[in-house]
Regions:
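N-terminal core-binding DNA-recognition domain of tyrosine recombinases/integrases
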Residues: 36-55, 59-141, 173
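Active-site/catalytic core of tyrosine-dependent DNA strand-transfer enzymes
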Residues: 242-304
Length: 382
């Protein structure tokens, strides 16, 4: 079994698609079923736009179909025992559990596609319902009623006490119900930058980067200088803030904050405060107030969320996103430094949480959230 990628001569109705993976067997014959699925993932399905994500799917299917070929098995004539043997063979070769689970996820998605398209009549594995907060394996299906998932029974347990986080659609649904605009901005800082609730409520306006002169689409560094703005353990670090969020924060600071600052001065008889966020009455935002806001939004949206869950959401998605550009250790260190963890061992929990998210969930997720931000452009009037 061999894996190849298309070059710039591969066209579909005149459109060039470079980097589409495809498999050939030892006799250099195309392997139709997985290639049809890889074509679907790369060309047809709109959510998977990254060539790196296509190749990840190709690598996972290459591993599985190589196992089938070496054992003289047909893909449409395997059962759960064959799946278990493949899983255990990867462990024997030293593959880490998170990698094994990601491969199980990709191949299970292939079989679901084949079942849907009538290429097979049953799934060669059993599923069980799990909750996102429990240690389970890859994410296969999201139940519309809540955080319930249909997970492959073959998936390996990775770690106890996985962090509770939201999927992108859940987070979007939750954040959209937050009001006023200020609360949505604070939520975005936790969701997109991994700030703690204590860091958001006490954020000093002086650390906010100026988007003027910067190219749209590129993130800006925000230095959380512990001498200026409170951080856990008084540790200085920087976070990368998406350009669209920086613009929104500046709009808030220019259009909404001056009115709140006057209320603050009238109420407290003090000079102007450097706090970026103030309540509608001009008071500093309390942690209890933020918790109450999230509790009400959870009831309204039907998505249970706490401030720390948004931070966990950042950690989980950011680890997977950076894993496409860095080694696993490099991605881990990046997330550790952005989140301000004192040790990589604390950050490692996101490696295991990432098993719950399939790769196409990651593809372009930041751009998707930034589009939501752009739609909130007149937020300061709400």
């Amino acid at each position: 079994m061999r894996l190849f990628l298309t070059d710039n001569t591969f066209k579909v109705h005149g459109q060039v698609y470079t980097g589409v993976p495809f498999l050939v067997d030892d006799e250099m014959a195309l392997v139709n079923a997985p290639n049809d699925y890889l074509f679907y993932v790369s060309v047809v399905r709109g959510r998977t736009a990254s060539a790196k994500t296509w190749q990840t799917y190709g690598n996972h299917l290459y591993e599985f179909f190589g196992f089938l070929e070496s054992n003289d098995l047909r893909w449409d004539n395997v059962n759960q025992t064959h799946f278990a043997a493949w899983r255990d063979s990867m462990l024997t070769r030293g593959c880490v559990r998170s990698t094994v689970n990601q491969r199980l996820s990709a191949v299970s998605n292939f079989y679901r596609w084949a079942l849907r398209d009538g290429l097979t009549h049953n799934l060669p594995f059993q599923t069980q319902e799990v909750w996102i907060a429990k240690p389970a394996g890859f994410l296969a299906h999201v139940d519309a009623k809540g955080n319930r998932f249909q997970a492959n029974e073959l998936t390996l347990r990775t770690a106890k006490g996985l962090p509770r986080f939201l999927l992108t659609e859940q987070a979007k649904q939750f954040v959209a119900t937050l009001s006023p605009w200020r609360n949505r901005l604070m939520a975005y800082l936790m969701w997109l930058c991994g700030l703690r609730r204590e860091e958001v409520t006490a954020l000093n306006m002086r650390v906010l980067p100026n988007p003027s002169g910067h190219a749209p689409g590129k993130g800006l560094r925000m230095m959380l200088d512990a001498k200026i703005t409170p951080t856990k353990g008084s540790k200085t670090r920087w976070v990368l803030v998406p350009y669209d969020l920086v613009v929104q924060l500046w709009d808030y600071m220019v259009f909404e904050r001056p009115r709140l600052t006057k209320l603050y001065q009238n109420k407290h008889g003090k000079d102007e405060t450097d706090l970026l966020f103030l309540t509608e009455y001009g008071n500093p935002i309390s942690l209890e107030g933020m918790n109450n806001t999230f509790r009400k939004a959870s009831e309204k949206s039907g998505v249970k969320c706490t401030p720390h869950m948004l931070r966990h959401t950042f950690g989980t998605y950011e680890f997977l996103r950076m894993s496409e550009h860095k080694s696993s250790d490099g991605a881990l260190h990046w997330v550790r430094d952005r989140m301000g963890h004192s040790s990589s061992s604390i950050t490692e929990v996101y490696i295991h949480a990432a098993d719950l998210v399939s790769h196409d969930e990651i593809d372009g997720y930041q751009a998707e959230i930034c589009e939501l931000l752009k739609g909130d452009v007149n937020g300061y009037s709400s």
